[in-house]
Amino acid sequence: MTEVKHRTYSSLEPDAEYSGDLKDGKKHGHGTLIFNDGTKYVGEFKDNVIHGHGTLTYADGDVYVGGFSEDTEHGHCTFNWADGDEYIGEVKMGDRDGIGIFKFANGSVYSGEWKNNVYEGRGEYTTPNGSKYIGEYKDGERSGNGSSVWVSGHKYKGEYKGDELCGQGTFTFSDGSTVTGEWRDSKLNGYAIRYDAAGNIIQKGIYKDNEWLHDKVN
């Protein structure tokens, strides 16, 4: 899958020029910060820190619009990268955390749950050519129960682990025939039964790395 970017306000150099509201000598209310590299923040401040809603425009053209809490991105946001990537969703203390959509410049889209900047929980991933996965993620990888549909017409429904078909699952070919059984590393490993498009058993037995070890014809 396409690599997901990450960038936060805390990575900026501390030196910046401020213009805006003050309270008791502190930045408080609405104001603008301009950093030495040309990065600019326009938005709300509280007790001398960025807090509330604002827009952070990096010198290279990346733009964050959304919530902040004590100098850290927090709440709902839209983050547009100069190269065309876009994230719309929740952030928690600088990390994508909660529900969000990441639209990649190449046309891939992930929509679903996040934790600590990676896909975590339930989500949907669509590739530029229209292939799609819907199911569970763990640590940024497909893990748990899910289903995939490829542009070729092939389908899979079952278990995943570490971004691979792993566990029990059914693979449906574009011609309507199916194979149901045990998978590991996206290959049949274990007992499986193959059916034709009408549902008749063609073959059943033990597979290893997609090769039959023991063939039993019904």
Say what each PLM segment does:
Residues M1-N218:
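Glycine/tyrosine- and acidic-biased, solvent-exposed loop/turn segments at the edges of beta-strands
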